[in-house]
């Protein structure tokens, strides 16, 4: 009697305890669905949804799986429910899909409450066939979990794009004031998420501006469907050799993997038999041999547990029926009275064909997209490292510009400095004269030419039109074209000529000093292109190097030794006058460069005095008349041009304390005096710095002709004696 009461009271107490526990579980869940009705025996099922929320459902004790599934679909308001299923774990930790035809209590042994998970059961081969926006949203959530758990392998670039689509769908458009790269670290997209990937996701997110959440989710699915393992349901098996293999169920067939390598594919039409017994799965495949005859191949796989083997078999049957059949197989109502062999399981849901081909009215539904789980934000180290070089480069640029400006303004001083010129050289195209020997039109060169205009707009017109001429030989033209001079516009300061370039040029010109070759008559115009602006400048007869364009003089030449004695004496007188004039004698230039140079350049960039500039602009050349028939008339014209080319400074410069050596004039009786400008070009290069005391290099080709007598040598010597007290300056540029 006592045992009876103990048993009865004990059962009642157990029921009360179970009822209280059920109520606690229902209160813990976010949503509670009472679907048991008036049933006294109630079971509680707790379903975890894809968005992370939980739903608690009360059902009758003998309720089947389809009742629970319908309650969840009704709660979600989901129409395309055939792609989804409820999954649970058994005591052997084997995952199973809840069978809608069987009792929940018989399938799920662990409870109550019975815990299940809503998952995508069949991955659509074409996501665009999904009609409902809610269906696509749930697919995105499932794929996101597959990638995060490592079930679905994803390359780096694809993972970055998919993560950017997730951010666009959840956060909307990128906002510079609100979003920073550290924001990406609050989300988890892949198992191993590096800072490099987060920065790439952040940059990719900016490109998806303007996409709505629905558009971003559609793009996500269209990108994810091309993954190799998309929609593959993997099961680990063992073959006869004892090695581990993986069978992947896909819409097209069964894949066979050895590790990560795909070694085979069995198409559904080629599979004739698929059955199981205990933990062995038998697969019979028909293939054509070389002769075209069908041959059957039998494959046997083993699994660790019989329940896992049956689960694999059921999944294969469902995949074949869903993707290959037009409709589910109807179960026969006649049940055999004999002992049943094998399983009676058949797929009872709709196929993909029925789901996509059935005309359904599109409906406008509203649902709430729940935010993803957030994690603690971390500071990106790569961003700091990436911005430091940029800041450093910007700082360097600023310092370079400031230094360049200081150097540009510092060029006004007389101290010799050689900073790097910030502005690029302006290309000036100098066309070789067609009359120059050894040069053609294809020898045209575009050299960087820098013009110092000395902040005078009027000086440009006076200097460009002041010089004409051509090189005497190919070597001379090449040596002159190798001169690299820097360019500045008015008001920007005078650039400096590199010392090494001037030194090399001076040495080249000095080597060519002794070479004698005939010079042709100069051109009267030259094309000068400055700053890519084609401007044809016709040079006038006003120039520093006055050229007597006379047919008679072009034929008659002065011996080089005569001209050398006279000009050397003039040079010695110039060198000994003042230190300032000696600096001016350093100026390197040629006849071609003088067409564009506006002032004389020296190593220290000392500008010419204002008086000398005015004198340069007021100089008039000697009159070039007709052909001189008499030698005496020619000599008078030459001596007149010599005196006119001398620059007379109005202010007498300070004379150095050193004793002045009076030049010795040697005037032979059988020759004529010339300043080297009779029908040819004269190039004088002064190189006085750095131990070079040779004076001015002279290039004057021979012109063998004789003059009977010198008629005006006396007046010329007297005039030059008077000019000794003034600043003498030759016509060299």
UniProtKB/Swiss-Prot annotation:
Record-annotated FERM domain positions: 43-327
Residue positions where Phosphoserine is found in the record: 39, 436, 517
Annotated InterPro entries: Band_41_domain, Ez/rad/moesin-like, FA, FERM/acyl-CoA-bd_prot_sf, FERM_2, FERM_central, FERM_CS, FERM_domain
Membrane topology recorded in Swiss-Prot or TrEMBL: Peripheral membrane protein
Pfam families, per database record: FA (PF08736), FERM_C (PF09380), FERM_M (PF00373), FERM_N (PF09379)
GO biological process: actomyosin structure organization; apical constriction; axial mesoderm morphogenesis; cellular response to transforming growth factor beta stimulus; ectoderm development; embryonic foregut morphogenesis; endoderm development; epithelial to mesenchymal transition
Gene Ontology annotations for the cellular component aspect, listed alphabetically: adherens junction; cytoskeleton; cytosol; focal adhesion; nucleoplasm; photoreceptor inner segment; plasma membrane; ruffle membrane
Keyword field contains Ribosomal protein: no
Disulfide bonds: none
Database matches in PROSITE patterns: FERM_1, FERM_2, FERM_3
Entry GO MF terms: cytoskeletal protein binding; protein domain specific binding
Job of this protein: Plays a role in the formation and organization of tight junctions during the establishment of polarity in epithelial cells.
Protein name from the UniProt record: Band 4.1-like protein 5
């Amino acid at each position: 009697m006592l045992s009876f009461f103990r048993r009865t009271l004990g059962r009642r107490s157990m029921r009360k305890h179970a009822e209280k526990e059920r109520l606690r579980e229902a209160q813990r869940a976010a949503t509670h669905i009472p679907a048991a009705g008036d049933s006294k025996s109630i079971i509680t099922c707790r379903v975890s949804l894809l968005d992370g929320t939980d739903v608690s459902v009360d059902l009758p004790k003998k309720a089947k799986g389809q009742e629970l599934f319908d309650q969840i679909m009704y709660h979600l308001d989901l129409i395309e429910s055939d792609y989804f299923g409820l999954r649970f774990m058994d005591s052997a930790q084997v995952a199973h899909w809840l069978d809608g035809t069987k009792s929940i209590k018989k399938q799920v042994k662990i409870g109550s409450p019975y815990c299940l998970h809503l998952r995508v059961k069949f991955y659509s081969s074409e996501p665009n066939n999904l009609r409902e926006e809610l269906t696509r949203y749930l697919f995105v959530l499932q794929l996101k979990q597959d990638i995060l758990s490592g079930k679905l392998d994803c390359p780096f670039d694809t993972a970055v794009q998919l993560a950017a689509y997730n951010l666009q769908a959840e956060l909307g458009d990128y906002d510079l004031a609100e979003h920073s790269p550290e924001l990406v670290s609050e989300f988890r997209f892949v198992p191993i998420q590096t800072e490099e990937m987060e920065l790439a996701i952040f940059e990719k997110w900016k490109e998806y501006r303007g996409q709505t959440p629905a558009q971003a989710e559609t793009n996500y699915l269209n990108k994810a469907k091309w993954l190799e393992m998309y929609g593959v349901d993997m099961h680990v098996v063992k073959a006869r050799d004892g090695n581990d293999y993986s069978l992947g169920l896909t819409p097209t067939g069964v894949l066979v993997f050895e590790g990560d390598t795909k070694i085979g594919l069995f198409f559904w039409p080629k599979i004739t038999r698929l059955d199981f017994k205990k933990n062995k799965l038998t697969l019979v495949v028909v293939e054509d041999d070389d002769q075209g005859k069908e041959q059957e191949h039998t494959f046997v796989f083993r699994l660790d547990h019989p329940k896992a083997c049956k689960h694999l078999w059921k999944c294969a049957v469902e995949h074949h029926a869903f993707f290959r059949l037009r409709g589910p197989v109807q179960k026969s109502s006649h049940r055999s009275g004999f002992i049943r062999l094998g399983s009676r399981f058949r797929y009872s849901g709709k196929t993909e064909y029925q789901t996509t081909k059935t005309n359904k009215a599109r409906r406008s539904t509203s649902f709430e997209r729940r935010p993803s789980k957030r994690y603690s934000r971390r500071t990106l180290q790569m961003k700091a490292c990436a911005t430091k070089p940029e800041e450093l480069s910007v700082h360097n640029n600023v310092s370079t510009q400031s230094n360049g400006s200081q150097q540009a303004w510092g060029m006004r001083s007389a101290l010799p400095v050689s900073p790097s010129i910030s502005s690029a050289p302006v290309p000036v195209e100098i066309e070789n004269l067609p009359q120059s020997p050894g040069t053609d039109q294809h020898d045209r060169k575009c050299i960087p030419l820098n013009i110092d205009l000395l902040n005078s707009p009027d000086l440009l017109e006076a200097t460009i039109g002041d010089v004409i001429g051509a090189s005497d030989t190919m070597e001379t033209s090449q040596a002159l074209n190798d001169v690299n001079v820097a360019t500045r516009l008015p008001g920007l300061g005078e650039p400096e000529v590199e010392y090494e370039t001037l030194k090399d040029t001076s040495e080249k010109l000095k080597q060519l000093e002794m070479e004698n070759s005939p010079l042709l008559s100069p051109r009267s115009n030259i094309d000068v292109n400055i700053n890519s602006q084609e401007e044809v400048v016709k040079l006038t007869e006003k120039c520093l190097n006055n050229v007597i364009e006379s047919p008679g003089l072009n034929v008659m030449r002065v011996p080089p030794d005569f001209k050398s004695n006279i000009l050397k004496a003039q040079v010695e007188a110039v060198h000994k006058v003042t230190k300032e004039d000696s600096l001016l004698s350093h100026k390197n230039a040629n006849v071609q460069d003088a067409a564009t140079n506006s002032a004389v350049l020296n190593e220290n960039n000392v500008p010419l005095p204002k008086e000398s500039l005015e004198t340069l602009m007021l100089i008039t050349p000697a009159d070039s008349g007709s052909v001189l028939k008499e030698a005496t008339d020619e000599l008078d014209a030459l001596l007149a041009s010599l005196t006119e080319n001398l620059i007379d400074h109005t202010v007498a410069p300070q004379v150095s304390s050193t004793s002045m050596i009076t030049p010795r004039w040697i005037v032979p009786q059988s020759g004529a005096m010339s300043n080297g400008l009779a029908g040819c070009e004269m190039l004088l290069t002064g190189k006085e710095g750095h131990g070079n005391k040779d004076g001015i290099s002279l290039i004057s080709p021979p012109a063998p002709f004789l003059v009977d007598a010198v008629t005006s040598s006396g007046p010329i010597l007297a005039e030059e004696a008077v000019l000794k007290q003034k600043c003498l300056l030759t016509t060299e540029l």
